[in-house]
């Protein structure tokens, strides 16, 4: 594995290797010294063309726990977000000798282009509405830790599927891992090509909840919308929000997930987000372990080992 650009690229063995490695990395968090020497002397660049606190910080902590040197590069504004400007940035990264570049970009496909311009490994940290592979991996890791398996589980993804890179990455990964995925959304918030996805589609949340092992709520992404996709926020919440009454329809063992940040009171009620079945806080903690695993698998080993491989 040279890059992590899309969960659609991951075979079952690849995905399981990341999850199993993340299990080992999670034990580092419980150790007296929460650090491994694995990536000492390697440089990881966090290249973020969109604002992000949660994901950028998670990657930074992950790299530092593996003893890598970390450079945070924040690029704001459209003048550096397309075409030659991205290529110029790639040339700068090459001059720095970056071993890995963690890239978040508003344009779908930007990390793929970057991967063709640099010799180091590229990790897609979210590109437009396309994908967010490490979010899907940490979601799968969280589900497996809570429920013990992924194969055969019924996972329901609810909300703004149209604009959600998290939904796309989860659909491909969870399907590869043997889960059955259903998406629930207003017709206006489903992508045109949804019929080609390996999912069932429903418009009735309450009918799906009793059959769900996992319910993953998505944030309504107003910043990516160019038109009104639903009448009002109140109407959206009434039809597709997860409140205490709807959560009571779920099986006792079922989990509630959210990639964050949440809009409390719209897509999810605080009483549900803070309930024992919620994994929201665990997802943040597990994100560090999963991103450690990804960086370890991409860069692990000494320079001599890499040159001889």
Swiss-Prot record:
Among PROSITE patterns, the record links this protein to: CARBAMOYLTRANSFERASE
**GO CC aspect terms:** cytosol
Can you provide one Gene Ontology molecular function annotated for this UniProt record?
aspartate carbamoyltransferase activity
Instruction: Kindly indicate whether the keyword Transferase belongs to this entry.
Output: yes
- Pathway(s) served: Pyrimidine metabolism; UMP biosynthesis via de novo pathway; (S)-dihydroorotate from bicarbonate: step 2/3
Superkingdom field: Bacteria
- Give the binding site residues for L-aspartate: 82, 165, 219
Matching entries from NCBIfam families are given as: asp_carb_tr, PRK00856.1
Assembly: Heterododecamer (2C3:3R2) of six catalytic PyrB chains organized as two trimers (C3), and six regulatory PyrI chains organized as three dimers (R2).
Q: What does this protein do?
A: Catalyzes the condensation of carbamoyl phosphate and aspartate to form carbamoyl aspartate and inorganic phosphate, the committed step in the de novo pyrimidine nucleotide biosynthesis pathway.
The identity of this protein, by name, is Aspartate carbamoyltransferase catalytic subunit
Organism equals Parafrankia sp. (strain EAN1pec)
The opening ranks of the lineage are: Bacteria, Bacillati, Actinomycetota, Actinomycetes, Frankiales
Q: Which gene encodes it?
A: pyrB
């Amino acid at each position: 594995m040279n890059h992590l650009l899309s969960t659609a690229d991951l075979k079952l063995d690849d995905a399981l290797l990341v999850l199993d490695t993340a299990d080992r990395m999670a034990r580092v968090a419980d150790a007296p010294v929460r650090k491994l020497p694995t990536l000492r002397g390697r440089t990881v660049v966090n290249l973020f063309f969109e604002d992000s606190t949660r994901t950028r910080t998670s990657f930074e902590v992950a790299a530092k726990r593996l003893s890598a040197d970390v450079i945070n590069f924040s690029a704001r504004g459209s003048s550096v977000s397309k075409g030659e400007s991205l290529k110029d940035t790639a040339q700068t990264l090459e001059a720095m000798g970056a071993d890995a570049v963690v890239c978040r970009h508003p344009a779908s496909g930007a990390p793929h282009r970057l991967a063709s311009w640099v010799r180091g490994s590229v990790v897609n940290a979210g590109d437009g509405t396309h994908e967010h592979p490490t979010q899907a991996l940490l979601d799968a890791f969280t589900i497996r830790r809570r429920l013990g398996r992924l194969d055969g589980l019924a996972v329901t993804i609810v909300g703004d599927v149209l604009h959600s890179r998290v939904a796309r990455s989860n659909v491909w990964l969870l399907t590869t891992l043997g889960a059955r995925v259903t998406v629930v959304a207003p017709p206006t918030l489903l992508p045109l090509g949804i019929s080609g996805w390996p999912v069932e589609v429903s418009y009735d949340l309450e009918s799906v909840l009793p059959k769900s092992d996992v319910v993953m709520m998505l944030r309504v992404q107003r910043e990516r919308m160019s038109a009104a996709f639903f009448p009002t926020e109140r109407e959206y919440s009434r039809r597709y929000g997860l409140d205490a009454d709807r959560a009571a329809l779920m099986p006792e063992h079922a989990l509630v997930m959210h990639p964050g940040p949440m809009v409390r009171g719209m897509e999810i009620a605080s009483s549900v987000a803070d309930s024992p079945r919620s994994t929201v806080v665990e997802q943040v903690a597990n994100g560090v372990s999963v991103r450690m695993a990804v960086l370890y698998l991409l860069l692990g080993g000494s320079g001599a080992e890499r040159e001889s491989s």
